[in-house]
Amino acid sequence: QLENQTSQEMESWSEKQSYIVLGSLIMASAQENIDTCPMEGFKSDILEDVLKIDKESEKIAVVLTLGYRAEDDNFQNFKKVRKPADKFIKFL
């Protein structure tokens, strides 16, 4: 139950929940032909200052950039490499 969680556990849970929204945003963007790039590993303290985030009540868990790729992007037409699903998925 959430009310019995420590603040650290709640923060961890909240961060994980942000990925549900992230996935939905990526899919919705793709439907509109908008490119996305999800990112972790950013300097959250600097980004929170730039965005004027209230650090007492809010935290940036993940960043998603949105936009349109350059028409002269040499990589956009490369064939995507995908492993067969049976090489990394095991159904139980």
What are these regions (language model features)?
Residues 1-92:
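Acidic, surface-exposed loops and disordered segments
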